[in-house]
Amino acid sequence: MQKEIRRDDIIGSRRFSNYFWAVFLCSGGISFLLAGISSYFKINFLPFANPKELAFIPQGLVMSFYGTLSIALAIYILGTLFWDIGSGYNEYNKVENLVKIVRKGFPGKNREILLTYPLTNIRAIGIKISEGLNPKRSIYLCLKDERQIPLTPVQQPNSISNLEEEAAELAKFLDLKLENL
């Protein structure tokens, strides 16, 4: 029975890089906001600097703006970490003849995203590799109606050999051809 069902877990937003950026933006944002407030009230709120000597307009105002923006972005990233946005699984079920793609979204009516496709509607497994400044290496589910559904999570790009091996295993499991997109 286990040879008829394959399940690949997907790590969502709970990656080290997101924790790093949340802490970095939060600490930097608080520091900038306190520096801006210190320059306005002429009271030093930072133990490691003396921002009360800064002119509030324009330096203190700009630092307050950047601090507020940074804290807002950190709160957004912490929200994605808390709700584990993007996590889920891909299930390939030969018994039910279905492919299920499940992901967590933001709270609301679409909190859980469920995509279900019959195996008969799947044309191939596709690999898309684009190099450059922002390289992307992904595996896609190619449907007969020409849609391409991404299967790989957002992360640092895998090596090309690992990506090809993973795609070949999946294509072999589903008895589908492998395409280069």
UniProtKB/Swiss-Prot annotation:
GO terms for biological process: photosynthesis. Pfam families: Ycf4 (PF02392). The chain crosses the membrane at residues 19-41, 61-83. It is a multi-pass membrane protein. The keyword Transmembrane helix applies. One of its GO terms (cellular component) is photosystem I. Keywords: Chloroplast, Membrane, Photosynthesis, Plastid, Thylakoid, Transmembrane, Transmembrane helix. It is found in: Plastid, Chloroplast thylakoid membrane. InterPro entries: PSI_Ycf4_assembly. Its main location: plastid. Belongs to the Ycf4 family. Seems to be required for the assembly of the photosystem I complex. This is Photosystem I assembly protein Ycf4.
